[in-house]
């Protein structure tokens, strides 16, 4: 007897793994895929990801569907009977649901051959360091290059049955931010003989609050958030080093350039003002998610005409998603899928309504069959 969608989701929820470490997840999915009829399936692996091609009856084009695979470094607090078995790891962004929906679609089309070719993409490392771009550039992917591509992301705030998306920009440009400061440590009783990097970091964090408000057009939008400050070893030792970690998010590419330029100027000022050395690392950078207008309009029209579906034309979000790299080269779209839970993405208590699994699979089967 084949597992239900809920069974699959719960099995995946128990084994969350970080980016490019999704070995158990890959093995579990491959076992599921191998249990399906193989008459028109072809399977490739890339690192910890999986590509599955479903040969269509006509095969005039290839439609791709992408699901991300990785979990987050979060200790789960849901208290569910299928809680994460990996300490300090959790599917707190819904990727367990994303994979389950993709498998549900794949299973349907393994039994019911589609008109067109389909490509199912199980992509590792969306949360970091970023799996989309290297997967897109891989030989394995380029052998099965699709003509269009689709993806979704769960939305805790919307009820089950809700689809939300928009033409054009959906998600922001994002960049990590790491700033390291190095000065001169010393005894707390002799501050004049040291260069205190805790004080320097504190000044810099305060200055960073003006980057958006005084440099970005108020009709545009940007965010600079500092999430971590590290510095010092003991209460009576002046810190020799400090580290600031944060994120930058902008709706426009120009604003991203402007924000980074301003941050670099402020860091240079800190170097002069506190006689220290500083370095900046932008870590992972994700480009914007830009929905192809023609294709997303077709999906919107389809969704609005379906009984039991509530469609919302949403605003842009500051969310980061490496699916944007696929959309840079392949026309397609992404949409929000309501999962009706009180807790947000990346929350240790996130508990999506599992009724969404069958809803999403049936909705997407119907849409794909129109292509």
From Swiss-Prot:
Entry-linked InterPro entries: AcetylDAP_deacetylase, Amidohydrolase, Bact_exopeptidase_dim_dom, Peptidase_M20, Peptidase_M20_dimer
SUPFAM superfamilies: Bacterial exopeptidase dimerisation domain (SSF55031), Zn-dependent exopeptidases (SSF53187)
Protein's UniProt keywords contain DNA-binding: no
Keywords: Amino-acid biosynthesis, Diaminopimelate biosynthesis, Hydrolase, Lysine biosynthesis
Residues of the active site: 68, 127 (proton acceptor)
Any one Pfam family match given in the protein's UniProt record, by short name: Peptidase_M20
Pathway(s) where this gene product acts: Amino-acid biosynthesis; L-lysine biosynthesis via DAP pathway; LL-2,6-diaminopimelate from (S)-tetrahydrodipicolinate (acetylase route): step 3/3
GO process annotations (BP): diaminopimelate biosynthetic process; lysine biosynthetic process via diaminopimelate
Matches recorded under NCBIfam families: amidohydrolases
Similarity section: Belongs to the peptidase M20A family. N-acetyldiaminopimelate deacetylase subfamily.
Protein's recorded name: N-acetyldiaminopimelate deacetylase
Organism: Halalkalibacterium halodurans (strain ATCC BAA-125 / DSM 18197 / FERM 7344 / JCM 9153 / C-125)
